[in-house]
Curated annotation (Swiss-Prot):
CDD domains registered for this protein in UniProt: NAD_synthase (cd00553)
Chain positions recorded as Mg(2+) binding sites: D51, E163
Pathway named in the protein's UniProt entry: Cofactor biosynthesis; NAD(+) biosynthesis; NAD(+) from deamido-NAD(+) (ammonia route): step 1/1
Organism: Bacillus cereus (strain 03BB102)
EC number annotated for this UniProt entry: 6.3.1.5
UniProt family annotation: Belongs to the NAD synthetase family.
Name of the protein this chain belongs to: NH(3)-dependent NAD(+) synthetase
Length: 272
C-alpha cells in the first residue's frame, strides 16, 4: 500500500461519494451520538465559511428530526468575531441558511487583547501574530465549551480530510470538539453536500480562509499552505498529482501527526 493509499484509509476518504447519501449518514451520526450521550443538543461556531455552514446545517437537520421523533434537543449557532469581521455578510447568509434554533454572538476581542497585553507585561515580549491567531482559535473553543457545559450541549468540530491531512487547524482550538460530522470529506465533496442542501453558491465558492492573522487579514488558506485545495482533494481522492505536491502533502501529514492523536504518553508508539 502506498503512503497515499495509507493516508486515504486513515482519513476515511472515499474517491467518489453520493452527496444525498452522505448527508443522510452524517445526520444519522449526529442523531445517534447525541442520543447515546444523553446530551441536550449541539453548539457550533459559525464563521460564514463552507465548513461551519455545512456542519451547522447538518446539526440543525439532526435536532429537528429528533424533535419530530419525540426528543428534546436544540442547536445553538455561535458567531465569534474578533472585532468586525470583513465577511460578516457571509456569516449572516450562513446563519439564514442554517436556520439554527438559537444564534448568539460573542466578540472575542476584549478577551484576546486582555490576554495578549498581560502576556506582554509578564513575559516582556509580544505574542507573534501567529500565536495570537492561535489564542483567538482557542478562545473561540473556550466559548463554545462554556455554552456546551452550561447547557448540556456537545461541541461540533468542522475538521475534514483536506484539513486533517495537512494539520491545518489549531490544536485545542478549532481542533477541539466532541464530534466531527465532516470527517472523511474532501473540500470539493463538502461543497457538493452544500449544493445538494440548496445553499447559496456564495457559501461554498468563497475563498477559504482561517482569518486568524491581524497582519494578513483574510489570507487565503491556499497561500498559507502553499498547496491548493484542488491538489489536496485530488491527492486524497487517489488521483495523480505532481511529485513535488505529493511530497509537500506527505511532509505536512507526517509532521502534523500529533494533532490527530491524543496527547502522547510513554505507552504510545505513533510518535516514535
Amino acid at each position: 500500500m502506498t503512503l497515499q493509499e495509507q493516508i486515504m484509509k486513515a482519513l476515511h476518504v472515499q474517491p467518489v461519494i453520493d452527496p444525498k447519501a452522505e448527508i443522510r449518514k452524517r445526520v444519522d451520526f449526529l442523531k445517534d451520538y447525541v442520543k447515546k450521550t444523553g446530551a441536550k443538543g449541539f453548539v457550533l461556531g459559525i464563521s460564514g465559511g463552507q465548513d461551519s455552514t455545512l456542519a451547522g446545517r447538518l446539526a440543525q437537520l439532526a435536532v429537528e428530526e429528533i424533535r419530530n421523533e419525540g426528543g428534546n434537543v436544540t442547536f445553538i449557532a455561535v458567531r465569534l468575531p474578533y472585532k468586525v469581521q470583513k465577511d460578516e455578510d457571509d456569516a449572516q447568509l450562513a446563519l439564514q441558511f442554517i436556520q439554527a434554533d438559537q444564534s448568539v454572538a460573542f466578540d472575542i476581542a476584549s478577551t484576546v487583547d486582555a490576554f495578549s497585553n498581560q502576556y506582554e507585561n509578564l513575559l516582556d515580549e509580544s505574542l507573534t501574530d501567529f500565536n495570537k491567531g492561535n489564542v483567538k482559535a482557542r478562545i473561540r473553543m473556550v466559548t463554545q465549551y462554556a455554552i456546551g457545559g452550561q447547557k448540556g450541549l456537545l461541541v461540533i468540530g468542522t475538521d475534514h480530510a483536506a484539513e486533517a491531512v495537512t494539520g491545518f487547524f489549531t490544536k485545542f482550538g478549532d481542533g477541539g470538539a466532541d464530534l466531527l460530522p465532516l470527517t472523511g470529506l474532501t473540500k470539493r465533496q463538502g461543497r457538493a453536500l452544500l449544493q445538494e442542501l440548496g445553499a447559496d453558491e456564495r457559501l461554498y465558492l468563497k475563498m477559504p480562509t482561517a482569518d486568524l492573522l491581524d497582519e494578513k487579514p483574510g489570507q487565503a488558506d491556499e497561500t498559507e499552505l502553499g498547496i491548493t485545495y484542488d491538489q489536496l482533494d485530488d491527492y486524497l481522492e487517489g488521483k495523480t498529482v505532481p511529485a513535488d505536491v505529493a511530497e509537500k502533502i506527505e511532509k505536512r501529514y507526517t509532521v502534523s501527526e500529533h494533532k490527530r492523536q491524543v496527547p502522547a504518553s510513554m505507552f504510545d508508539d505513533w510518535w516514535k
